[in-house]
Structure formats: structure tokens, C-alpha cells
């Protein structure tokens, strides 16, 4: 169960803080609801407390997970799918899971493609969305703000020569 003050992640909206827990009567049934403030979009999200995990709400990763996250951003297989539509859908679906490592994989794949052939406008938007979602969670894990989290993500990405990776994968 989540309590007021818990830092959580909603798979579609990013990371936030539980700001309120209250009982509400909906369709004649009294239920507990959580109000989650999502700073990324300044959204107040109301989620049934007993169904929060079922919709994918989870706790923010801990600082100890950041090293694994950095490894995911910098190493691993690169998907060479040539069909833009399939590649876009697969990346979008990975982002929708809300899984921090799936989002990091999307960022890695799009960073390589960006340094190779470049990104389409749709992929560029997806790349920016993935970085914002990841930063919304990294900020809580690192105890910083979103800008500092984005700087950390960009620093990790830039630590790898994606141009060399793209060239080796024949994406140049």
C-alpha cells in the first residue's frame, strides 16, 4: 500500500508523490483513493488505492538501482529494425510499460539511431518523451530536480561513442 509522501511512478504519466489519501463514494461504493502529484505535467492523478498496483503504479527506484540503469543506457543489444512503423510501435509500447529499464533501452536505441541515420520527427518526440519520463524518476532516486536528472541521463548517454556504435551497426 502507498501512503502520503511516497514517491511513486505511474506508467503513463511518470514519477510523482502521493499527496493525499481519502475516502470517496463512487456509484454508491466507498473506496480509498490516492492523489498523486506528477510534477512533469503538473497533473493531479486520482487512483483507487486498492487498484493502484493493478494499473502499474509502483515505487520509485532506489539510488542503488542507478548503476544498473546507467549500464542499460550504455550497453546491450541494439535493435536494427529497418521498418520505421514497427520500430516506433515497439519503442512506444516499451515506454508505456513504465518499466525504467525498458525506457532506458528505448533511449539507448534511439540515441544510436540519432547518431547514425538520424531520427524521424516522430522518433525524436518519442526520444524526448522517454528521457523526460526517465528523468522524472531519476530525480527522486538521486534526490535532485528534473533538470539535474536530465543532465545525468545526457552525461551517461554521452559517455558512450554512439557514433562508433552506429557505424559498426551500419547505421551511418
Residue ranges, per PLM feature:
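Charge/polar-rich, low-complexity and marginally structured segments
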Residues: 50, 55-172
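A positional/architectural concept
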Residues: 1-57
Amino acid at each position: 500500500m502507498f501512503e502520503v509522501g511516497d514517491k511513486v511512478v505511474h506508467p503513463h504519466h511518470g514519477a510523482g508523490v502521493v499527496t493525499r489519501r481519502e475516502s470517496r463514494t463512487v456509484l454508491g461504493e466507498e473506496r480509498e483513493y490516492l492523489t498523486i502529484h506528477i510534477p512533469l505535467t503538473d497533473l493531479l492523478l486520482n487512483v483507487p488505492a486498492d487498484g493502484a498496483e493493478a494499473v502499474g503504479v509502483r515505487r520509485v527506484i532506489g539510488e542503488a538501482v542507478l548503476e544498473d540503469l546507467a549500464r542499460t543506457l550504455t550497453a546491450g543489444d541494439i535493435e536494427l529494425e529497418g521498418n520505421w512503423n514497427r520500430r516506433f510501435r515497439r519503442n512506444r509500447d516499451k515506454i508505456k510499460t513504465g518499466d525504467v529499464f525498458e525506457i532506458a533501452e528505448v533511449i539507448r536505441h534511439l540515441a544510436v539511431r540519432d547518431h547514425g541515420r538520424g531520427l524521424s520527427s516522430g522518433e525524436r518526440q518519442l526520444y524526448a518523451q522517454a528521457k523526460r519520463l526517465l528523468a522524472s524518476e531519476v530525480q527522486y532516486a538521486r534526490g535532485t530536480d528534473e533538470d539535474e536528472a536530465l543532465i545525468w541521463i545526457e552525461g551517461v548517454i554521452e559517455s558512450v561513442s554512439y557514433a562508433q556504435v552506429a557505424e559498426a551497426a551500419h547505421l551511418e
